[in-house]
């Protein structure tokens, strides 16, 4: 115990010539040197108190309750809001497509705690993803709805230099009809005299007679068609007109079953075969 006594009696600041005590020797305090060194290292490290996660419900509610200007503790000593937003923008611009960096460093919990509240809220509730640039191009955008234009008129277009239609009066029409019944074709002298009496031109009278003759021809053809349809007999189709001798099958049946049938009725006199043959449809048509 002599070295321990010398060390205690030696004044402070004076270098001792004795060799330093080994790590396994017990000093006067009774604790090993390694334990003392470990205690010093642990005392140098700051003790981190367990704090709730910044994205938990309690942390968000506590941040909202605090006034915006009076933040204390580790959050108040962090970087300003502008620098935090700049760091967040840099992180989003570097890897917009990959949610987790591959081969890089993950942001620490302390860095997440220093982020502003707006950034955390946006990270938790992301908005709808924007359309990619290739979808915004007009090549992939849906075509606008087409408005259906009205169909073009398919009526016959008249000539531009066409003369207007002549409006005949009732007296003129009656005189023209009366003259047409008397004579359908007028001579040049008759047409000139008749047009002057009606205060019309010869061309107007001539065109009216031409149209009236065409109309009379159409009416005459329609009347002839009606007469032809009425003159045709209303006969049944030829498929049902089967000719066979009257009484032929009855005679054959009587000769075949006459002896064996006790309830045979007396048959009517039948004419010889082939004497009276008639078309069934024709006979029924004339009998009715």
Curated annotation (Swiss-Prot):
According to the entry, DNA is bound by residues in: 161-220
Q: Name one GO cellular component term.
A: nucleoplasm
Tree of life domain = Eukaryota
> Which segments carry the region annotation Disordered?
1-111, 123-152
Principal localisation: nucleus
Composition bias of kind Low complexity appears in 1-12
Compartments, record wording? Nucleus
Single biological process term from Gene Ontology: embryonic forelimb morphogenesis
Any one GO molecular-function label of the UniProt entry: RNA polymerase II transcription regulatory region sequence-specific DNA binding
Q: Which UniProt keywords apply?
A: Developmental protein, DNA-binding, Homeobox, Nucleus
CDD domains the record matches? homeodomain
Q: What is known about what this protein does?
A: Probably plays a role in patterning events during embryonic limb development. May also be involved in programmed cell death.
Q: Which family does it belong to?
A: Belongs to the Msh homeobox family.
Q: What is this protein called?
A: Homeobox protein GHOX-7
Origin species, per record, is: Gallus gallus
The organism's taxonomy opens as: Eukaryota, Metazoa, Chordata, Craniata, Vertebrata
